[in-house]
């Protein structure tokens, strides 16, 4: 691993103000001087910087690539650089390591966890599998490496329906960990032998149906972009089914799907039900459209732990490096590859 010269005056000046609290690293502004230094340090380290769609705007703007976790992991695997700096939560950096086992993968703050990934443990999945011998395990990519290793096929929010539909209809399916995405898959496929784990993303689960209905009534001409992890996804379909909102303007989309739809929408206003960091990319994609959050408090504290200070520290110190046990990585890689073989993985979340 590259070790940078800590005698650099500007590096010393910027890092001198870094603070470390349980909420993350602080003390550094994401200004133009910081951005220029991040780019310089990344070049010196031979690193490419990847940022998830839910990251702070300053982090997204300085990154070499912005996207969802699976798309970024593919970029990591194909990038010529030997070091990957993944600005996202921990399971995302693990996935990048799984697909790029010979590269150095860094995450600016290893404390950046995920409530959804943490909602099922390997032991819980093993016990669930024991209750349903012979069942096929389908896991959302928003899971830890250890859970992926116990999984038959991974899926994304874009291809979850296709993955489940590809499985023998007579075999039971265990879908984890997101209950709202699982409910969406069950609704679309009509599959009765699909068992859904009761996990959730605390941010998406907090975007509720009442808020969505209120916003839809207040903005009757808007389109709705709703992430399938949201607790309000069923409410969105109910509004359309009852005629309270035109069905053609209700779209259940992954983050990648939202970006694609932003480029083609004819709506002047779009209500967005997902983590608020997504608004930055949507507004860049279609600046003439008024994108508004259904819930402007839907901010992931873990995503926001990747601060300007954390990224600076990461590039100066080469920390925090992500390690995945080779055996777990090999098993997890197989479940991801099976998903890709089925096709249409689209957006990771």
Curated annotation (Swiss-Prot):
Query: What is the disulfide pattern of this chain?
Result: none
Q: Where in the cell is it found?
A: Cytoplasm
What pathway is this protein a component of?
A: Cofactor biosynthesis; NAD(+) biosynthesis; quinolinate from iminoaspartate: step 1/1
**Can you cite a GO biological process for this protein?**
'de novo' NAD biosynthetic process from L-aspartate
What InterPro entries does the entry give? NadA, NadA_sf, Quinolinate_synth_type2
Major place of residence: cytoplasm
Its GO CC terms?
cytosol; peptidoglycan-based cell wall
According to the UniProt entry, what is the EC number of this protein?
2.5.1.72
Q: What are the protein's GO molecular function terms? A: 4 iron, 4 sulfur cluster binding; metal ion binding; quinolinate synthetase A activity
Q: Which Pfam families match?
A: NadA
Which cofactor is recorded for it?
[4Fe-4S] cluster
Reaction catalysed by this chain?
A: iminosuccinate + dihydroxyacetone phosphate = quinolinate + phosphate + 2 H2O + H(+)
What does the entry list as the binding residues for [4Fe-4S] cluster? 114, 201, 300
Keywords assigned = 4Fe-4S, Cytoplasm, Iron, Iron-sulfur, Metal-binding, Pyridine nucleotide biosynthesis, Transferase
Residues binding iminosuccinate: 52, 69, 140-142, 157, 227-229, 255
The note on the cofactor says:
Binds 1 [4Fe-4S] cluster per subunit.
Any remaining note in the record? Was identified as a high-confidence drug target.
Functional description taken from the UniProt entry: Catalyzes the condensation of iminoaspartate with dihydroxyacetone phosphate to form quinolinate.
Concerning its family, UniProt says: Belongs to the quinolinate synthase family. Type 2 subfamily.
According to UniProt, the name of this protein is Quinolinate synthase
Q: Which organism is it from?
A: Mycobacterium tuberculosis (strain ATCC 25618 / H37Rv)
Coding gene? Answer: nadA
